[in-house]
Amino acid sequence: TALTADINTFLKVNISWQHYYPACSSAPWQIDGVAQKLKRDGFNKLIAAHNGTVVVDPIEGRENNKHQLVEDRLGLDHVVLDAPPIKWVPYRPTAKMLVLDDVYQDGLYIPEVFPGTNIVQLPTVKTHVFTTMTGALKNAFGGLLHRYRHWTHSVIHETLVDLLQIQKEIH
């Protein structure tokens, strides 16, 4: 469905490494361009969403990749999805999951702030040892699966299908 301007719109930033390596993380000019366009189109509730990994510090990555600089200049709010005050809550997809029910046998959890909002995935196009190529949908991986998302690498393609189903349900 189309984005709605009167609700929160998350810009899901990709931080693959806390050090700046071109093409590893969302480029600052990508955040700048997308946010400016959305603002011109009447989207005033923009929130940059970041997440860490088991090896990446999202606060350090936000600063080193110049995301914070752009977000501050544009007056964007930001959240770190895997740090307080953000809570992860149980979520039961209505769509049949291909693999996530098997991988996460104790249930799926998603950020409490996501349901009922818009999301714009800011992709990177890079290679990955397990996923071959990554892009916008792979970026949903960090926003919808918590710290143990690497458990899904062996079934990554099916995982991405499941995540698309969840994303369609909650955004």
Regions found by a protein language model. Name each.
Residues 1-171:
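N-terminal and secondary-structure boundary signal
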